């Protein structure tokens, strides 16, 4: 008779998408790991909320690069950066979008347009109970979701469930009941009722009353727990799944670790936002580079890689920018975290830096050096 199998049953818990904890798993190791994943999600979501969505217009050029014109203050700028979009504020909305994206295969957003002007009025989470046309939805797919049955967290926790459950039996309880092989359900109900009463009775001071026919036999064994190496392994698997170093969470990451995390985790999400928002929120005629169009529009996101630069690197950039200017004074101020100033939209260069269209124009440009002298020096 398989008494143990009839009396006790084990079941795998389902992942709670809000708390990132598995139902019925109350072990400290599981809760610790779940909180660890929640911190990872918060870090990624908070990084995304720092960026700004820039609605821009490019002017086509027959020679050289197309020039960019900012459309700050447009309907897209207002909705993407400022309006609450059905939540407390704009940052709260984008934080929820990213958190959903970290635990689901995709996130659908519904864009609300003005029927008369075609302007974007709002951007909301799609209603699961309503059917939409594909072109009506901004669909963001998750690069971290594994499949429909599990997530990175659930997959990692599954590997430790067996060990914890196998070591869960701590003792035997002899109760005042007769075991009828043909009626194990009644026996099981009596056993569970007895255990429940004992737990409720011991909730006050740890003591519980039992009758004179009830006996508790504690098993002399080491209860199953996770050691440090196993915890570190789980943390490593989780961090690797998000291309993250633990120092990122601790605030002690090196510049290389920060840039790797940003390039591997944050920028792929930003690129997807750029492409999907541009494709679904800007009309085809305004978006495509077609004959007859002088301008075309995009939504771009600043990757903010300059925020990882050290003060020395920013100073070096300032000096190099004088020799070969690529940023105006105001652009440099913004990259250093300062505000633009009036009259700062100029390039500053020393006298050794000149503007040329072709490298051959540099030959003989200095008054004190002739073309022949330069050739001889070479």
UniProtKB/Swiss-Prot annotation:
Q: Where does it localize? A: Virion
- Record keywords: Capsid protein, Viral capsid assembly, Viral genome ejection through host cell envelope, Viral genome packaging, Viral long flexible tail ejection system, Viral penetration into host cytoplasm, Viral release from host cell, Virion, Virus entry into host cell
GO annotation, cellular component aspect: viral capsid
Grouped into one coarse class, the protein's main location is virion
Highest taxon listed in the record's lineage:
Viruses
Q: Is this entry keyworded Hydrolase?
A: no
GO BP term (any one): symbiont genome ejection through host cell envelope, long flexible tail mechanism
User: Partners and quaternary state?
Assistant: Homododecamer.
Functional note: Forms the portal vertex of the capsid. This portal plays critical roles in head assembly, genome packaging, neck/tail attachment, and genome ejection. The portal protein multimerizes as a single ring-shaped homododecamer arranged around a central channel. Binds to the terminase subunits to form the packaging machine. Necessary to ensure correct procapsid size during capsid assembly. Once the capsid is packaged with the DNA, the terminase complex is substituted by the connector proteins gp15.
Sequence similarity:
Belongs to the skunalikevirus portal protein family.
Question: Which protein is depicted?
Answer: Probable portal protein
